[in-house]
Each structure stands twice: as C-alpha cells, then as structure tokens.
Amino acid sequence: MPLPKRFRLNAKNYFLTYPQCSISKEERLAQLQNLSTPVNKKYIKICKESHEDGQPHLHVLIQFEGKYQCTNNRFFDLVSSTRSAHFHPNIQGAKSSSDVKTYIDKDGDTVEWGEFQIDGRSARGGQQSANDTYAKALNSASAEEALQIIKEEQPQHFFLQFHNIVSNANRIFQTPPEPWVPPFQQASFNNVPAIMTQWVSDNVCDAAARPMRPLSLVVEGPSRTGKTLWARSLGPHNYICGHMDLSPKIYSNNAWYNVIDDIPPHYVKHFKEFMGAQRDWQSNCKYGKPIQIKGGIPTIFLCNPGPQSSYKDYLSEEKNRSLNDWVQKNAIYVTIEEAIFTTGSQTSP
C-alpha cells in the first residue's frame, strides 16, 4: 500500500481559503504577520466573504519575497482568542497574484498589510485583456485608483508609457479648483474707492448678467493695503500669482473674473486677451499643452508702484504708446495710497 503523499507547496504567492472562520480580520492579519518563515513576507490581503448560509468565509493572499516551501499543511491554521477553536485553510499556490487580488477584492470587506507585488500573469492564460483593464480604470473613482489598476494589470504599459498614462488619467479625472474661501467678510473692506465699488457692480457677475465685453481693472498701491484680499473676496475667480499657469488645476472656465497678482506687466502673457476680456482664445504657456480659454470675463491686475512692477510706468514708456491707447479703452486704472479696510479691528484683513 503506497504511503500517503506528504504535503508540499513551493510558491511565491499563496492563496488561502478559510471556511466558516469567525475571527476578526484584524486578528487574522496579526496572526499571519507573526508567522515565522525563512522568506520575508511582502504583502498580505484578507477578505471576509459572507455566504448564503450566513457563515463568514475568509480569503487570503500572501506574497513572499521569494519562493517559500511549506511542508506543514497546518502551518497557516488560525486560533480563536475567545474560544478553543482552530481554523484550517485550503492552501493553493496563486498562479496570478493579480487575479487573486481582484477576486478577493470583489466583496470589499478587506484589510491589507505591506505593498502589493505586481505580476503580469493571468490565470486566464496570458496577460490581462487591455480593454478589460482600461474599462475598469475608467470606471474607478479617481486618477490614483485608475493608475493602480493599470499598474497591477498592465505593468508593461505602465512602465513604458508612464508619462502618457499619468497625463491622461489626470485629465480624465481632473477636478475643478477648490473654491477660495475669503478669511474676511466683504463688509471688512469699508474704505474701497467708489470707482472700484462701481466697477464690481458693473462687471463682476455670472455669465447671464455679465456685459458682452466687460472692462478690466488695474489697482496699484503699496503692500499690505488689502488689495489681494479684496480682489479675491468678490466671487468665484481664477487667481494667478508668480507666473502664468493656465492649467486646469489652476484655471477654471466657469470663474466670474481673473486676478493677476504681482506679475510684472512685461511678463503677462496674453496681456490683451486678459485685459480685453476676449473670448475663445488659445494658450500654449511654457511646458504646458495648448488649451482653449473660454474667456469673456474681466481681470483685476494688482501691482505695487515702482520700476518693473507698475503698469502705469510700463504703459507710459514711449514704445508702449499704442498699447496704452488700447488699455484706456479696455480697463479702469485706480491708484490707492492707503488701506482699503479700517485698521485696528481684529477682524480686519
């Protein structure tokens, strides 16, 4: 009579199934983490699945740094800490850790430890279908989730086309800029020149009430007079400061107006498009892809007095005479000398 075959499994990825296992996911994870093996564990994922009979089943994926040879079919047994009970799993080698991870993810009640080790194999005989992968990525909730799906199921694409994949994911899942919340109420700005208040009334509004060609506003004044906080408190806007960035992460075509702050006039790309509230124009700012700007909204230009900063000084140069004539028809220029809010109040800007 032949001797019973000894248990032996030599694999890098283990797929365990525990029927009728009532131990919590966290306790199971702790017990599996504490198992002593000659090969380091890299990743553990546990899923609790409730069958029709109401009994919880447990699926586990364990990934090792290299192949681990298991000769004890009781090695992965779990022990209840509240009663005298052992839970013995069915033990298999996972031909495709990606497929196993997808399978045990289906119920969503999971816990994991470590970093998943990607492979390019599929139990269906070959690589994952690219269409299946990208359909799953498109149906995911965020760019990060989509990229993780592609990384796990299409590692070759992810490695060789990383730049394009990341760029496409960010475009597909792009979110509008977070609306800015003013730290002070509009009433705090109680020293605003009447011409600026009237400009707001005439030009800053939603698309339905906005003039066909609104006027822009240039405000020049010393630092710490409240220019920026006032300009940003008027409604939904695009705020551009430091350099011209019209990427979708910064610029929204649904804004009511733009604020261009502390950018020297000779560095303002699309000067006329912004100041003239022009419509439907294109931008290809440095290092960015060409984008379509809806336009038709006014712009507030904020600057300090002095060389290289003042729009007034820039436009008064002889070489800019014709540009200055154009600006007079498309913008209102205001110079302030003092704070546009009342000082001394704790709620003042």
From Swiss-Prot:
Binding of ATP, residues: 221-228
Q: State the active site.
A: 103 (for dna cleavage activity)
Q: Where do the segments described as Oligomerization lie?
A: 156-176
Give residue ranges for domain CRESS-DNA virus Rep endonuclease: 8-116
Q: List the keywords (alphabetical).
A: ATP-binding, Covalent protein-DNA linkage, DNA replication, DNA-binding, Endonuclease, Helicase, Host nucleus, Host-virus interaction, Hydrolase, Metal-binding, Multifunctional enzyme, Nuclease, Nucleotide-binding, Nucleotidyltransferase, Transferase
Q: Which family does it belong to?
A: Belongs to the geminiviridae Rep protein family.
Print the domain comment field.
There are 3 rolling circle replication (RCR) motifs. RCR-2 is probably involved in metal coordination. RCR-3 is required for phosphodiester bond cleavage for initiation of RCR.
- Supply the name of the protein: Replication-associated protein
